[in-house]
Amino acid sequence: MMRRTAPIFSVATVKNLIDGKFTESKATKFYDVINPATGSVIAKCPQSTPEEMRAAVENSAAAQVAWRNTSVGNRVRVMLKYQQLIRENSKQIAEILTEEQGKTLGDAEGDLFRGLEVVEHTCSMGTLIMGETVENVSAHMDTYSYRQPLGVTAGICPFNFPAMIPLWMFPVAITAGNAMLLKPSEKVPLTSMKLAELALQAGVPAGIVNVIHGGHDAVNFICDAPEIRAISFVGGNAAGEYIHARGTKNGKRVQANLGAKNHGVIMPDADKDHALNSLIGSSIGACGQRCMALSTAVFVGDAKKWIPELAERASKLRPGPGNKNSDFGPMITKEARDRAIRLITESEKLGAKVLVDGRNVTVPEHPNGNWIGASVVTDVTTEMPCYKEEIFGPALVVLTVDTLDDAINMINKNPYGNGTSIFTSSGIAARKFQHDVDAGQVGINVPIPVPLPYFSFTGSRASIRGDINFYGKQGVQFYTQVKTISSNWNPKFKNTGATVNMPILGKDQ
């Protein structure tokens, strides 16, 4: 059991969720769930057995038959109750999230709230799932289409957003009439288990959300199981490319959000305070472990004179435990911390300057935490490791260019295309940037342009695999299939014999 002033959730051994029951796994192999701020083991996460995974997917397939025939209104009512329960338990969920992932409580609450917004949007499913109709495509004939659920779907979640990403996935999938087999990150399974527990309390039927655990074997099972029709994945490039290739080979839909290298372009006419504060907050916040972190600053022309002030402001941020008054928490693992340090050090050897150096930062009260401080690295070129690779840590890489065209060309040559931002007071510059830049999400004086769920998360190029994006209208499209019906209610069919020619619709007959 985790030690708390008040118990939140039993986490001695994380359980599977199958058929509405939290059951102990018969696994013989377990992952340690480690508090990254203290280095202490707070739970054991099983590698679900093949028999447990098969039982989970078969149960989901059986349960989905009745669920798909439940009216969309009743499915929405379950989501209305669910969003209420999330709100009522938000403090508790944030505390669980902070303990297993390391985020500050404020950031954990934001993580949860951005997922809650997706749950709220699913409460409009009756409108989102509407089909189309054309009357009189031919005499007495109508054609109409509607969206039907796929069946069993799967979600494979990352460590960096333990609440938001699962809530991108299963609420949309199940409100559209599917079942979902969820696999949380083995590093942060506790938040997902709490969200699943609340889903059952809200009235989600047994089997409609099942949860298994594991690593490579669990991923392979999801990619190969014939019952699973679609896979939603968020995580790194290697895993995402693998899941997309293996899943699509087996005939499944796959949407995979992968790595990123998001650039923030600073024009000389930008509001200096807003631009610098935005760069620092979006690159250092969450210890830089966001797929939409603005990790790369591109100063255009005379804006480069602000770089020393940028460094001064960044140097004031301090890491620490998420439940204290810290600016940001630790890295998720020691390996992730060491990798970030390596990329900075290798680039320094190639000529980069480390104006703010967080590589040797310590937090005395928690010496075993995965600590790294804020870093600002300047004089960077596009050939350096800190630019070519995603650091995924609290480091801001700084480059300078002469013109906006130079900045756009740099961004477009980078293989990633998750998001980008420009800071300017010129509508002309902003319009040119949004039109010419090749990125899925563009911010204008907005540092992290992740859209609200009325729209969809729209990465591009090497940052996305699959052609249907997350949440919003596209999320509904991903979890449904279109059926088109042509009906003929002619009051008096003519007995003209069998017609062997291709029928021509659209003519009065």
Regions inferred by a protein language model and the residue ranges of each:
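Glycine-rich loop-to-alpha-helix module at the N-terminal edge of alpha/beta enzyme cores
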Residues: 40-130, 140
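Hydrophobic face of amphipathic alpha-helices that form TPR/SEL1-like repeat modules
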Residues: 2-37, 359
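ALDH superfamily catalytic-core signature
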Residues: 238-381, 404, 410, 444, ...
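Structural signal for hydrophobic packing residues in well-ordered secondary-structure cores
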Residues: 64, 68, 83-90, 94, ...
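Short, well-ordered beta-strand elements within core beta-sheets of diverse protein domains
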Residues: 42-48, 63-69, 155, 264-267, ...
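Residue-level signal for inorganic ion chemistry
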Residues: 39, 75, 97, 119, ...
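Conserved C-terminal structural/oligomerization subdomain of aldehyde/semialdehyde dehydrogenase
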Residues: 38-44, 204, 228, 265, ...
